[in-house]
A protein has these predicted regions:
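N-terminal secretory signal peptides
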Residues: 1-16
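Short Gly/aromatic-enriched secondary-structure transition segments
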Residues: 69-75
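N-terminal export signals
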Residues: 20-43
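Catalytic cores of enzyme domains
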Residues: 150-199
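Catalytic-core regions built around general acid/base machinery
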Residues: 138-151
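Short acidic, glycine/serine/threonine-rich loops at helix termini
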Residues: 66-68, 129-132, 165-170
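Metallocofactor- and cofactor-centric catalytic cores in central/energy metabolism, strongly enriched
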Residues: 44-46, 50-53, 60, 64, ...
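Short hydrophobic segments within beta-strands
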Residues: 55-57, 157
Length: 199
């Protein structure tokens, strides 16, 4: 799912010629009171810009948050993953599975260390070192801590990852907690809802 298309490639696909793009950048440079020689420099920087990497981890969840985003209309899922972000890992909709999926996750975290957005849906079970929910033999709590190290920010999608949700309800047999109870040193944005939809 890793995207390699740059903004320059997308503009070319839309029929914007390199000449027109350079002219636009030179005009923009002059409007910003920069010398005309900055036009090509701006063009190179813009054309090489990649979409932000997104790693989406599902923990104790029902997949309702993922289902809700696959049915979104503004933007559509296609626009989101092909034009706005590079959805490098999301096991529900990705083709890879097993060891291949684990390799994709490891590569995405390594290649984008410090720059990727980490999206989490589902609460994190803590009882018995998180053994009640594992992916690829790794507990959710260990996976979250590892992925959070290289994340620029964490986005909690749904009430479960934001506040613990249904898994945290009494008697809470897995000792489910929200992401913020585990990760304290990263910016976290909570988007609660079950699922988070606009109406």
């Amino acid at each position: 799912m890793s995207a390699t298309r740059t903004i320059g490639q997308r503009l070319a696909e839309e029929g914007v010629s390199r000449r027109a793009f350079l002219k636009f950048c030179t005009t923009l440079a002059s409007m910003m009171a920069l010398p005309p020689s900055m036009g090509p420099v701006m063009a190179q920087a813009i054309a090489a810009k990649r979409r932000p990497s997104v790693i989406w981890l599902p923990f104790q969840e029902c997949t309702g948050c993922t289902e809700s985003i696959t049915r979104s209309g503004t933007p559509t899922l296609e626009t989101l993953i092909f034009d706005l972000v590079s959805l490098d890992y999301q096991e529900t909709i990705m083709a890879a599975a097993g060891h291949q999926a684990e390799g994709v996750l490891a590569a995405a975290m390594k290649e984008n260390f410090g720059k990727y957005l980490l999206i989490v849906d589902g609460s994190v079970p803590l009882i018995e070192d998180g053994a009640y929910s594992c992916i690829g033999g790794q507990s959710n709590v260990a996976m979250l801590k590892e992925a959070a190290k290289g994340a620029a920010a964490i986005i909690c999608v749904g009430t479960c990852s934001s506040y613990g949700g249904i898994p945290k309800a009494d008697p809470n047999p897995t000792q489910a907690v929200p992401v913020s109870a585990v990760i304290k040193d990263k910016p976290i944005v909570n988007i609660p809802g079950c699922p988070p939809i606009r109406w």
